[in-house]
Amino acid sequence: MRILYAASEARPFAASGGLADVAGSLPKALCAAGQEACVVMPYYVNSLKPEQKEKMNYITNFTVPVGWRSQYCGLFSQQVDGVTYFFIDNEFYFKRDNGLYGYFDDAERYVFFSRAVLEMLKYIQFKPQVINSNDWQCALIPVYYDLFYRNAGGCYDNIKHVFTIHNIGYQGQYG
């Protein structure tokens, strides 16, 4: 089975809690069990160690529809312990100095991320059978899939979705 594990944080690249531990270990365990698993997360450039930045592989860039405009998205990758990590880059959203979360525009940041995860599938060789979306930051991935990609064909054919909540206390409620 080919599984894309979408998370807002993953060890060894960025961590604020237990989600990063799971996102860093579960895909590795799935690969060890004979499955194909990759991780996709934001490219928090200020959270990376210099040696992690040096090992980043640029794949491409594209635009992501966000409301009434299109936003730049860079796509990078890196292999760690047999797992491919994909990184969604946009410095406006993810180059922050004071941690991963708690910004006035968190809702918009993860709207962008959720849509970018689906857009990136056009540009990578990995074609998931399942996307496992984790916590509120990735909650729109299955929604956007149903709205915009389900009938698009090609790399979007027959993708199943799993939504995992790691801490029900963090719901990403805005308004």
Each predicted region: which residue ranges?
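Catalytic cores of nucleotide-sugar-dependent glycosyltransferases that transfer UDP/GDP/TDP-activated
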Residues: 1-175
